[in-house]
């Protein structure tokens, strides 16, 4: 048994699993596995207080569900990372269509929570289709940008903008301004990396800023959150105040596992404010290391993406890592009271089935695009292949 297991990961193994293992970026794979593990660890720290707050008898209710979602997310990531770039495009096409179809139906059959209709509820679970739409959108617009560059009459840029505006319109109907901002940033990054003229990018940025400003006047919850951020003395800032106190209370080394006190007063401690739980129980050194781990994943992912030869693979992989990094940045910035509050999860760390599965899909797609293939990277042969036509 041991010899068979060893052979499965030997360089001479030509099975699908063996080829996957030796062509996948194992540094990124390991860093992602560490994030998933930390997410499960922190769920056991936050679950008792979260369960008690909403009257659930099983104090590890959220932790056990988190472990289930983390396992499912890991399996999804591994399966997706084995796909070819062509299969990634196909999967993104069908995922985007499915997610958009459900988002269109949400106003009629969706579950409303906190004034927004973003979820489909069934069999005790809730599904947020916009989470799956995000990586699919980035892959599709990257594909369209690449097709447009070929000069074969495909209106790639126009199709990419159409896909983007459809997604934005449906997000604003829910409403979900945070996800709109997130996909706009990732779309803009893909737009820039595709080599679009800077004047177009500046125009897109201007429109995006104008649109973001208009949400302050169009949506009451956005107006309220911005006002709380700008005038904390004149508004109820209980949650963000308690989160900040939790971070300060942890000091450098934290109170210790399970010893957090301030987390009991943070309503969304297991989701949006899990970072403050990490800081209180494990300290600033741990929470800074968590930021460093996210930075490693994003920076290494972007570095590898920039070395790819194929325009689609390069832009799509980079866009997916921007998506992950920006979401982590927004969540942590909210916890540190640097920006107005926004219900956005910390990738792989916060509790949430849709978020966990979608992040597994996102990183799986990115890992698949970064895999070592003949001709995928430069002629230097950095990854042992060299160009196919060399």
From Swiss-Prot:
The keyword Amino-acid biosynthesis does not apply. Changing residue 145 to L: Decreases interaction with SidA. Its main location: membrane. It is a multi-pass membrane protein. It is found in: Cell inner membrane. It comes from the Bacteria. It catalyses: [GlcNAc-(1->4)-Mur2Ac(oyl-L-Ala-gamma-D-Glu-L-Lys-D-Ala-D-Ala)](n)-di-trans,octa-cis-undecaprenyl diphosphate + beta-D-GlcNAc-(1->4)-Mur2Ac(oyl-L-Ala-gamma-D-Glu-L-Lys-D-Ala-D-Ala)-di-trans,octa-cis-undecaprenyl diphosphate = [GlcNAc-(1->4)-Mur2Ac(oyl-L-Ala-gamma-D-Glu-L-Lys-D-Ala-D-Ala)](n+1)-di-trans,octa-cis-undecaprenyl diphosphate + di-trans,octa-cis-undecaprenyl diphosphate + H(+). GO terms for biological process: cell division; cell wall organization; peptidoglycan biosynthetic process; regulation of cell shape. Pfam families: FTSW_RODA_SPOVE (PF01098). Its EC number is 2.4.99.28. GO terms for molecular function: lipid-linked peptidoglycan transporter activity; peptidoglycan glycosyltransferase activity. The keyword Membrane applies. InterPro entries: FtsW, FtsW/RodA. The chain crosses the membrane at residues 27-47, 60-80, 91-111, 125-145, 153-173, 181-201, 279-299, 315-335, 348-368. GO terms for cellular component: cell division site; plasma membrane. Pathway: Cell wall biogenesis; peptidoglycan biosynthesis. Keywords: Cell cycle, Cell division, Cell inner membrane, Cell membrane, Cell shape, Cell wall biogenesis/degradation, Glycosyltransferase, Membrane, Peptidoglycan synthesis, Transferase, Transmembrane, Transmembrane helix. It is an enzyme of class 2 (transferase). Belongs to the SEDS family. FtsW subfamily. Interacts with FtsI, FtsN and the cell division inhibitor SidA. Peptidoglycan polymerase that is essential for cell division. PANTHER family: CELL CYCLE PROTEIN, PEPTIDOGLYCAN GLYCOSYLTRANSFERASE FTSW-RELATED. NCBIfam families: ftsW. This is Probable peptidoglycan glycosyltransferase FtsW. It comes from Caulobacter vibrioides (strain NA1000 / CB15N) (Caulobacter crescentus). The lineage of its organism: Bacteria, Pseudomonadati, Pseudomonadota, Alphaproteobacteria, Caulobacterales.
